[in-house]
Amino acid sequence: MDEFHRYGKEDSSWQQCFLYPLFFQEDLYAIYHDHYLDGSSSSESMEHLSSNDQFSFLTVKRLIGQIRQQNNSIVFFLNCDPNPLVDRNKSFYYESVLEGLTLVLEVPFSIRSKYSVEGMNEWKSFRSIHSIFPFLEDKFPHSNYILDTRIPYSIHPEILVRTFRRWIRDAPSLHPLRSVLYKYRNSPDNFQKSIIIDPRVNTRFLLFLWNHYVYGCESILVPLLKRSFHPRSLSHGSFPDQTHFDRKIKHIIRNYRRNSLKSIWSLKDPRIHYVRYAERSIIAIKGTHLLVKKCRYHLPIFRQFYFHLWSEPYRVCSHQLSKNCSSSLGYFLRVRMKPLLVRTKMLDELFITDLITDEFDPIVPIVPIIGLLAREKLCDISGRPISKLYWTSLTDDDILDRFDRIWKNIFHYYSGSLDRDGLYRIKYILSLSCAKTLACKHKSTIRVVRKELGPELFKKDFSKEREFYFPAFSSKAAARSQRERIWHSDIPQINPLANSWQKIQDLKS
């Protein structure tokens, strides 16, 4: 594999003309087989590989030999034989060749994505960007609108073939891909003319198609956004005196040379931040409402012209960050931009400058969180804790661990908020729901359960968390940290409530 990558880096045309012979090389499949046995792949685990009962490298090897002999009995694209046994064999061959085709196509795709991403200033477009807003305190104070876009699932197979043809000139390798795509489209599970690509389905071929499609979209969209919105020169904070800022900018423009107008005018360009996870992409913009309306208008047009795909306008939602709540992965973001007046006095006391800036104040959105807890049967819609009857068959340690994991994720995410009343309420709901679940399991009362467990009902609380964050701090520094907003930026796992949040989003769409 290292040799493949080295050849692909030295000669860009090499990766476009060698694919078709690889379909008949047993060594490549053996390389991937050893690769998964060693456990060196981060995107696929051996458990997932073994869970697919229809795939076998030995079957692929035998199938390659039959293809070399031009045995037409294994043509898996036809559905003319009514014999169910033959249909099962065709389906078996089809799934095997499908996996082998995916393995071969991933080689040039990984090479191309690796070096093109390096040229995009570390924009990681090949995989989904797992971002749950810990970076917002540094980035989003300069943004006031959010565009929430859902990437459509339905894609015509010919569009996927054309996107592959943009960077693969090996025509023979595209023919089996086109046949497989049309076979998948005509399967009994899919009655539409388009392919329904669902990244939540644990299929290697679908995940590869989804990543390739989104990568092709972002490789064009992200550089356009960066060139259009990213400031190219001085930052907005370079001018300490921001009183009548627009008037001063106009005065500077009249006196500066023509070649410096663009660099100065770029100070007024809006800032933009792009985040994607799975089928949702979030674009944060600093600008006016008119600019947001233009973005909502141009994003569907961009998909329509570049990918020949009609994207419904309702899939692009816009809302103001200070008035509405944004959500991703089961986490909710709501901020409050408070005006902060800073008075600057010069050393010679000639004049005093007033600086008016916005202070980033994250808020714990208690109502959406209670809605997710109610959907998970941890409380009712009014926030009253109830017992989780589905968990009564588990052991006491498993019940405590599940409630503790939910609480730790919520606390780690929302601990940056200065207002802790919402967090205390969520902790009360979870602790009482845990006590009711244990009491229902042992046919006891909540008082007995709380008396037996005591402080172990939840292992983490606010004071222990702060000691964990600042173990080397003095007591004075620890007391000061209680007043500061500290974001826990290392959250290794997804919020357990994300599945419920995804179901709510699917119902809305």
Swiss-Prot record:
Keyword Plastid: yes
Protein keywords: Chloroplast, mRNA processing, Plastid, RNA-binding, tRNA processing
Biological process, per Gene Ontology: mRNA processing; RNA splicing; tRNA processing
Top-level taxon of origin: Eukaryota
One Pfam family, short name: MatK_N
Protein location: Plastid, Chloroplast
GO molecular function, one term: RNA binding
GO CC terms in record: chloroplast
Main location: plastid
Record function comment: Usually encoded in the trnK tRNA gene intron. Probably assists in splicing its own and other chloroplast group II introns.
Family per similarity comment: Belongs to the intron maturase 2 family. MatK subfamily.
Protein name (record): Maturase K
Gene this protein is translated from: matK
